[in-house]
Curated annotation (Swiss-Prot):
Top-level taxon: Bacteria
Entry-linked NCBIfam families: Hfq, PRK00395.1
Comp. bias regions, Polar residues: 70-96
Positions of disulphide bridges: none
Family membership: Belongs to the Hfq family.
Pfam families cross-referenced by the UniProt entry: Hfq
InterPro entries: Hfq, LSM_dom_sf, Sm
Name of the protein: RNA-binding protein Hfq
A biological process from GO: regulation of RNA stability
Any one Gene Ontology cellular component term annotated for this protein: cytosol
Subunit structure: Homohexamer.
Annotated spans, Disordered: 63-102
């Protein structure tokens, strides 16, 4: 497995397996929403009212509607993760603002 996919595949697979609604932002700013039906090395099949094949090179960000556990028990790498959910980053920013005002 390529090093770049050691985080990508377990994350996308957890979103697919748990049928988590996602927002996918493309590099041109368009927001797509749906559930990940399938994916491979180059594309993600996103299902909403219709299925769309979205090329990964056009994707900027994948945002799950809720936190997911994406650690793979059979992966050869470490179980620690550098991935942070969007809400955590927002909370950290709000905490910093609060601390600065005190």
């Amino acid at each position: 497995m390529a090093k770049g996919q050691s985080l990508q595949d377990p994350f996308l697979n957890a979103l697919r397996r748990e049928r988590v609604p996602v927002s996918i932002y493309l590099v041109n700013g368009i927001k797509l929403q749906g559930q990940i039906e399938s994916f491979d090395q180059f594309v993600i099949l996103l299902k909403n009212t219709v299925s769309q094949m979205v090329y990964k090179h056009a994707i900027s960000t994948v945002v799950p509607s809720r936190p997911v556990s994406h650690h793979s028990n059979n992966a050869g790498g470490s179980t620690s993760s550098n991935y942070h959910h969007g809400s955590s980053a927002q909370n950290t920013s709000a905490q910093q603002d609060s601390e600065e005002n005190e």
